[in-house]
Amino acid sequence: MDKCDGCVELNKMHGGTKTSDYYYTTSLGARLDSMDYALCALKSKGPAAKFKKRLGAKAVKSFEREAFNAHGILKSNDATTYRAISARGNYLGQDRADGSYSSKELCREFSAPNEHSLQKLKRLGRYYKGKPRLVYKYPFAKEPATEVTVYCDTDFAGCSQTRRSTSGGCVMVGGAQVKHWSKTQSTIALSSGEAELVGIGSGCAQGLGMQSLAADMGWQLKLSVHSDATAAIGIAKRRGLGKIRHLHCTDLWIQERVRNGDLQLHKILGTDNPADMYTKYVDAGIMEKALRKQNLFFMEGRAKLAPDTMGLKEQK
């Protein structure tokens, strides 16, 4: 499209960062994620001109600047630096559960990082500087654990460019978190139920792996998987495909596992699901609530047994 057709509105998306916080819809309700089209709408005359006047020149210039930066591909040296730091952030994300999703998103832009990618990297760095220490709490138990508990969640079509969904979750044993993950689904789900089913499949696979590891160590643990997706839980508990034949058969092995009693599926409220932090950007309140449910806490200072690799003690 070269010109704007119809009245244009500015809407606020749920979550996201600066340049992805806004999207445009025409009078027909069609969603347009293209920055080029959005700028065309702002610069055109006619119905969009009234919108531009109502929005204000300052806001328009701010949006134009953000849109330009989003398309500003980094130079070779800057791109190499971006990849190196993002790779270290991804390595750190294995321990820092609060940065798992952000690190994953940074690594997705390795092929062609732009100014927007760099801003997200800086934002993650500022967050780690403000919250340098995340402590895993392993409570003392008089009796050994009897169950592996998995929390999983999916953000349907969370990526505005590819429309792919993000699945994430955590594994708990004895009230302590032992594993977490956040990954983009390899295929584009046709519905939220299908995306959530794939997410439940990932959670079940992680739980079965931990259950098998415990069995090798002589612990016979039950497996309990929690999700806030009613439709996906219904599909996983039923027998056969019915009217959902378009789903991949590779995702329906969960039905057999449920029938055999190898695992149990439970419904959990979305507000109580700690896996929400692994599928999208969340605010501080949701993040801290999810971390507390996983027995993770922020602390000040530096751990006594932490290696002094940068000579910080000598500087003091």
Residue positions per predicted region:
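Signature of WW domains and closely related Tyr/Trp-rich beta-sheet microdomains
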Residues: 1-56, 60-61
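Acidic carboxylate-rich catalytic motifs and surrounding loops in phosphoryl-/glycosyl-chemistry enzymes
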Residues: 104, 138-140, 179-182, 261-273
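RNase H-like nuclease module associated with reverse transcription
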Residues: 109, 145-147, 186-316
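Short coil/turn segments at secondary-structure boundaries
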Residues: 19-21, 28, 35-39, 44-45, ...
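C-terminal reverse transcriptase regions that engage the nucleic-acid substrate
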Residues: 55-133, 269, 277-279
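RNase H-like nuclease fold core
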Residues: 89, 147-193
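Short hydrophobic beta-strand that contains or immediately precedes a catalytic carboxylate
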Residues: 24, 149-152, 225
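Structured nucleic-acid-interacting core domains from mobile-element enzymes and related host factors
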Residues: 126-154, 218-219
